[in-house]
Amino acid sequence: MAEAISKLAEQNGSQVGYTMGELMVASAAREIRDSEVVFVGMRLPLIAFVVAKRTHAPNAVGLFENGVIRTTPAAELIYTMADPPNILGATQCLDMLSVMSLLQSGRVHLGFLGAAEVDRYGNLNSTQVRGPKGLVRLPGSGGACDIASLAQRFVVSLDHDRQRLPERVSYITSPGNGDGKNWRQRVGLPRGGPSAVLRQKQFCVLMMMARLTSHRFIPA
């Protein structure tokens, strides 16, 4: 059934000149403001950065965790942040410590993150989830906890699934607004927090059209 809905959604999207994936990219691109410094990441946010640069945010600057800083998108498709096209033509090639220092100093405006779960307060879990056979270990934080803690704001991108949107995550890998109630200030995270989650939602209403929804989190 899910496959049938996805196929129908893609067909309906094509009738108006775009696919659901393209709509997700456009929505992510709109989160990038001109002249902002952005922790880009990979996959969907990487394409969103290119779209933003070519439309409304020509002065945005892209950061990558491996130390690459770009004021122009890579000239060719990249699969990892260390691929040669991402190095060629970079504004700077530093190291992880240097770009994380930019983050710590408050000079990173936006970061794009993914997770296995996100709750109503914007807390992210990418460490462990409970499956049919018990706990399942996941890859963990990477740089996500740093970005969630220290960027001026962050945006979450994930596929819509009820299990991935619990009331409260079972494990906080990367902090959003904790339990609310000025939590970030109380624990020493005076700036930042989640601003939006971008998700592709599938539902059945008449023609079962798929929609992109942008959910705003409960503030700190």
Predicted regions and their residues:
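N-terminal active-site beta-alpha-beta segment that forms phosphate/nucleotide-binding
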Residues: S6-G89
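Conserved phosphate- and dinucleotide-binding cores of soluble alpha/beta proteins
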Residues: M1-A9, E76-A220
